[in-house]
Amino acid sequence: SASELSERIVRTTKGTAELESMQAIFPSITKFGMAALLPGRSISVNDSMDVLVDGNSTRSTLERSAILNATPKASVAIQYNDLLNMKKDERRELGAGKDVIYIYHNSIDAIGDKAPTESKVFDACETAIQELSGILRIIVNELSGTNIFITADHGFLYTYKPLNESDKIDRKAFSGNV
């Protein structure tokens, strides 16, 4: 999916795209990956399996935005759908004076994380590529974005068969600093 998005960006914009990979955090699930993409010195997990950055919760977009605001850069975090539903003037106001804007898009997770819909994950990837291509236009045209980084909090391996118990790790294996 990343390669397809990169190719589409090059085809439809006057810009360039570079595709790089890196090691995902373990376990490779959304709440850990989103925390790993935030600035901070430490990532930890409490007994309720909440992921913390420098002791601060990362559960909600508001909490992740607070972590961003603790850095010297002027920044904000927002959900993709919230940004999309804003009027043009509201989006411009949101981006005014910001050095960094985190836009969270989770349509693949929303489909792939649930057993009844996980077989639709490939369609969700195509939808995500279309939506991300569209949001790029908003970032460039309305938010004056020039350097845009599209990241993934984790990858996924899709199988048509359920995982064996031996493929899973007990949650008790994770506690404290990661």
Question: Which residue ranges define each predicted feature?
Answer:
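Feature captures the catalytic ectodomains and active-site-proximal regions of enzymes
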Residues: 1-178
